Amino acid sequence: MAYDAKKIYYRFDDHLSRLVLDYEASRQISPESENLYHGLPTDPYDEGLFVEHNVKRGLRNADGSGVVAGLTRISDVHGYNKIDGKVVPDQGKLTLRGYNIEDLVNNAQAENRYGYEEVAYLLITGSLPNKEELDGFCERLGAFRHLSDEYVKEFPMTTVSSSIMNVLQRAVLLLYAFDAEPDAITPEHEIDVAISMLARLPRIAAFAHMASVAKRRGSEVHVPHPTPGLSTAETILQVLRGGMAFTRDEAMLLDVMLMLHAEHGGGNNSTFACRVLSSSATDPYSADAAAIGSLKGPRHGGANAKVVSMHEDIRAHVSNWEDEDEVAAYLGKILDKQAFDGTGLIYGMGHAVYTLSDPRAEVCRHYARSLAAKKDLGEEFALIERIERLAPQVMRDHGMTKPICANIDLYTGFIYKMLGVPETLFTPLFAVARMAGWSAHRMEELFCAHRIIRPAYRPVIEPLEYKPLADR
């Protein structure tokens, strides 16, 4: 099915222009009303108030560990031990339903098969599938990949945005209207919606990218029918490349990335957002859209693009990539806010939980190396490894005392670029993969927790006497 993108976007742009004019007109306000903009309090609260009231800022304890807000059987993100009340760094470990992530990835790769579907089944059901169960699950995913003509007629209008993550939110909310019982809260309905999301979101994300390209070119938007029997990784590459113009190695590496991003505990911002909404017993589409909105934030899911920009900056300003002293000196400039974006951050280094190692980063490094060599990108890959090795010492030299290790984002952007994935899809692919974890956590919150999440905020305001309007 094809749509005239130029016509669609012209209609939207005309509407947007009217909105901009209306907004500018609304800004023609009296000087007295400027307080509406300049009177907004933006000063941070006195640090002493947080200590006085024992506030767990960011739901973190004073030692940086997370406040325990619930129990889960879905995954374990381990990066330290607590001994005698103190945080003791440890090698990172990620287990999904009790299974080590390295074992899940390595076994799928050793058997030369795609593993994301197995991980999704494991997360949703709580057990590893046998071959018959896995084949049946993949068959159901294939059946759900199709987007109905009625949905596609509406969906192109939702693709008008500078952010594909914003498009995904609206696309997910639109699916509510095509569900016969969208507010049903039963295990059967939740599993059906989860499978629907796992199947459709990869194509929706890729289609949203194609629509934005069509807008720039003034061409039609084509919605190809899904090809039966393809894995999630193959489905994504098929839409992006307009056919099967990709290698098995490329699809297998993308599959590894999907597996590594599928789940990462209940306390990360997007999963917690999904659980917060689910605790109110709202519909799954609303909870999933909220999780996507959280992941869109640059403090959560948007770091991989920053890492790519930083790598490009380092390659441009370091003349000899093999000179460790020169690389370390430039990393020092970044920390001193004299290079790159001026934030003083080395992106891709450090994590809220992992201290000595991020197991996902180690898996990324292992599987990316061979494809980088095949694509003649070995020197760029070696530079990233050099950054990973040198950055912790450079950061210690700048006074940082906590253990620092590379996180998965250090390699993610490089891998996606190597696979030809456009930067605008980096975070959307994160969302595509994480839908498995979000779905599992939503069901656990709905059927095991049975209580709405409602923390408290301590008021730090003084009582005031009301003045009549004429006396102000």
Give the role of each language-model region:
Residues 2-472:
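Non-transmembrane, aqueous-exposed alpha-helical and coiled segments at domain scale
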